[in-house]
């Protein structure tokens, strides 16, 4: 439920001293203001849902509010849109949102299209420390891991395992 988002994000922000992201389908600028009120430090802007001008406008709102914007792309056209909108942080979703197949090499392939001065984050499908090592060697600056951690019965151990190759 919608109220769970508010409670969860606030509880997380109260419990940790690290940046948090509102990983949601941001489709209205109001949601960016909500993210700020909830204590998020970053919002996810999905290029598959937003045209270049909308990404640019939402990114400007983020800048005014002191929020980071992670602009997510899945293919070359979406990466180009993110860059044209002025993204300083691009995330590449390794999960194809049309058929839900996963290929972590999507990040290594698209890394070549994104200038090195733009932070590059690999998202989805990262399951092992070896996956992370491969991504880091390809120039990836960070990873966004959700499902692997959430499915693990021992999340702390899994996180230590994933960090072991960085």
Predicted features and spans:
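Charged helix-capping and loop-helix junction motifs
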Residues: 6-10, 103-109
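Catalytic cores of alpha/beta
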Residues: 27-39, 76-85, 122, 126-145, ...
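Catalytic beta/alpha-barrel core
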Residues: 18-28, 41-52, 65-79, 91-101, ...
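Glycine-rich phosphate-binding active-site loops on the catalytic face of alpha/beta enzymes
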Residues: 34-54, 91-100, 140-158
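C-terminal helical cap(s) of enzyme catalytic domains, especially alpha/beta-barrels
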Residues: 109-113, 136, 151-166
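Acidic/glycine-rich phosphate/pyrophosphate-binding loops and surrounding catalytic core
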Residues: 6-15, 21-22, 28-37, 42
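Glycine-enriched alpha-helix->loop->beta-strand junction motifs that scaffold or abut catalytic
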Residues: 15-18, 37-43, 63-67, 84-91, ...
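Short, small-residue-biased leader/transition segments that mark boundaries at the very start
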Residues: 1-5
